[in-house]
Amino acid sequence: MGKIIGIDLGTTNSCLAIMDGKTAKVIENAEGHRTTPSVVAYTDSGEILVGQAAKRQAVTNPDNTFFAIKRLIGRKYDDKAVQEDIKKKVPYAVIKADNGDAWVATKEGKKMAPPQVSAEVLRKMKKTAEDYLGEPVTEAVITVPAYFNDSQRQATKDAGKIAGLEVKRIINEPTAAALAYGVDSKKGEQTVAVYDLGGGTFDISIIEIADVDGDNQIEVLSTNGDTFLGGEDFDLALMNYLIDEFKKEQGIDLHNDKLALQRVREAAEKAKVELSSAQQTDVNLPYITADATGPKHLNIKVTRAKFESLVSDLVMRSLEPCKKALEDAGLSKSDITEVLLVGGQTRMPLVQEKVKEFFGKEPRKDVNPDEAVAVGAAIQGGVLAGDVKDVLLLDVTPLSLGIETMGGVMTKLIERNTTIPTKKSQVFSTAEDNQPAVTIHVLQGEREMASANKSLGRFDLADIPPAPRGMPQIEVTFDIDANGILNVSAKDKATGKEQNIVIKSSSGLSEEDIEKMVQDAEANAEADKKFHDLVTARNTADNLIHSSRKAIQELGDKVTAAEKEKIEEACKELEAATKSDDKQAIEAKTKALEEAFAPIAQKAYAEQAQAAGAQGGAKAEEPKKEEDVVDADFEDVEDDKK
């Protein structure tokens, strides 16, 4: 059985970890970084860039560079959040798919589902793991925000499938962080608050870590959050301030210039990071735009105090879910023994200060906020693979689940913060005399009114024998698996007839859609390989042309005019071939140049060897002088000093 890798698929950055023996290890990507930007770009040449390479070219390719895709995953286009919070904040096109989902489109009109874009990031993670392990990787544990609903969880599983990964478990991010902390800590019973403020989402989980018969039992008592609160919002607040200040100075609104907007966005993110350690920073963007009077430059000084005033409402927004999580767990602030900070945005001093004020204790600084979630996912992978024996994880469902009943009311079968996996049944009946069928409308949320909650799906139980209203007994069963994904069945107790629905297409993608996307991903992998091979052939050709011409120059009169002409002709033909996309032609002309140059190289080598032999013979006659020999001191260098 291969390794089950752990992936933190983040809004802004993603991270990969694996179990290395008994410990989880974060794996660096091909660029040598421990986290990878969750950015995917489609270039004019048809190449797909992922991570740092995609982020670097975002300024010049804003329409086709997709970031913060996690905020769209599993969402409908008409969602208030999509219309208000996303469409206005990104330079790329967000469109309505045929099934009503929020999709994205390139400027060339290629439409893509968010899981399809996220799959590119997962493919890079998969490749990183395979390069490190030297073997194929097909299984993963992927983390999601604790407050993700069923559709968002399913869409994340779909992204894994498109990337060629079987998602063995979907695990909540704060739970994963507690797992990373809990496995390392051997301090007996603890009640831990995990405050997770990432790039796009915020979660708070209250978790109990206990030693039960020598096993680390990690039980989630409650969870709460906001799927539209994260570092991206902090960047945006600073970006809007910079644009407003520039408008005051120059009278030009940069909101309408996509290129300038992307430059300001990047500068805002950089300034935000700098202000976590410095009291002030300069945002300097020369030639940001131009008008009739000439080019304009943006140069604005931002102090930490100014930035904190811009985002203080965002930080305060995170404290309300903290109150609710404590209430749901039936605990007070004094019951919390440790506070863990997770997510890059928790590096901001104001966040740390407000969390300390709220819980009345100093948050721990020994947990890496960028890596803890991936480490926890890898540990869960180790548990599932049987490599980690002494850990028991008890997670919860973040939102209540139920069905619509008479009068448009939601009747809850499973309350929020119920430990999963779980199964619950309840008997319902008909609303009319001789009603032949009932529609089971499955809902997720906390509101009394059915229409105010998230609809997960509908199905009908038909052929109910004629009977007065209230007589037939329809047993509805909700079954949630360990991923937090739901199965619902309805059974007529009189006839035994049963109908069920696996809430699996609530991500909006059918099996056929996913299969097509898997094939597209494989085709892209093939195209990427062809592109890579073509570039390699061109590089080989360029090196050969350079070395051949240099050698001819160095050999001078030792090469005849006819030989020089033959080599130059072969070089020119190869140069012409490298300008095409025909790999075979490049390789054929490369071979032709190699063959043309081979006799010259042999002749030069023979002459060189002959000259060296003659020189060596002359030197052999000279006696060696003893004083030329020096004794050197050698020192053993231990591995840890290397």
Swiss-Prot record:
Known role: Acts as a chaperone.
Acidic residues biased stretches: 628-642
UniProt name for this protein: Chaperone protein DnaK
Name of the coding gene: dnaK
Region (Disordered) location: 609-642
Organism lineage: Bacteria, Pseudomonadati, Pseudomonadota, Gammaproteobacteria, Thiotrichales
Annotated transmembrane regions: none
Recorded family membership: Belongs to the heat shock protein 70 family.
UniProt keyword annotations, A-Z: ATP-binding, Chaperone, Nucleotide-binding, Phosphoprotein, Stress response
GO MF: ATP binding; ATP-dependent protein folding chaperone; unfolded protein binding
Gene3D superfamilies reported for this sequence: 1.20.1270.10, 3.30.420.40, Actin, Chain A, domain 4, Substrate Binding Domain Of DNAk, Chain A, domain 1
SUPFAM superfamilies: Actin-like ATPase domain, Heat shock protein 70kD (HSP70), C-terminal subdomain, Heat shock protein 70kD (HSP70), peptide-binding domain
Pfam families the record matches: HSP70
Alphabetized InterPro entries for the sequence: ATPase_NBD, Chaperone_DnaK, Heat_shock_70_CS, HSP70_C_sf, HSP70_peptide-bd_sf, Hsp_70_fam
